[in-house]
């Protein structure tokens, strides 16, 4: 009865010292994590719950993502980190088991040319560290947290890779569209130069008008070259994501883009970021690992208890040789209590506590960063969507203005400056219209990534 009472009283004591306490997962986040201006819709499936194949339906893009998931070196490195963490976890699990070793030994000796004496021993040794004070337990829980962190990191890299490939792919499509606009404009402005020169020959325009038109035409030709260079650079960037050499990227045209922005965006509750966003999960796992590291530092103040023993056959009994050999067994129990370690244990505990606080701050910052990214992506989506109709109407109005001023110039009722202004305004609006369409797509991709992005 006294022994049972002793055990019952020791367990709460050790728990109170912190070496047997368990990590409590974070379960609350600020409800306004996404910002006060972002309305939360919980009636539909969140964008972050969609699989990437459901969001990106372009076959060319899907093929590129598959290649990236297979070849990308950063993702492969993340997978190797998981393998390392799995090995560490296996080692931590087996630390509770006793260790065994076989150490056979034989000698042949002769003194003053007497008959040689042979001795042998075949011992099997065993040792077992008893985990009375939680050191092994906390190490195992820390290894498990680090394993989960490595898996979360792998998923975070995969989500970023998918978003990066998609963003780069649609960037190429946007640049293709802008290149087409500039090439058409180059042809149109070339015709305007010819028309202005004809008017000058007829005495209806001057040399300044021709020079201005030619300068504008040459500027567009330079823009065409710049866009071709940008396309090459973006193709190379995408090739790097695929871990492949520079190459032309097969893609659909901008007019065939199948990406549709949802009419209403559902982003879910802020608490879902703890479950959906892998980098936030990884930061929390790091905090959990630091928690158990602190427990391990506390347990180092307590005694270590171990059992060891050996058993085997030997023909050496001190100075006597016995043939045949006899069975020999021994067992030893030991307890080691740290008394004075030059402040090492106290220092390790302080370091562990500080690292735990750092991990908590990093987790809190990761959560704030995630909320900010969701907020910015949502506002960008709303802004680009609101601008879309305005830009469409602007382009339509400028097309009318350009055609009208061109006709008026041919009839001598307006100047070349008005035509030039209309041309430049139309080109700028068309490029802006294309860029805004790309921004609509990009902000959905960024929002998908900010919400965690399902990787199935």
Predicted regions span which residues?
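Repeat-solenoid scaffold signature
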Residues: 202-230
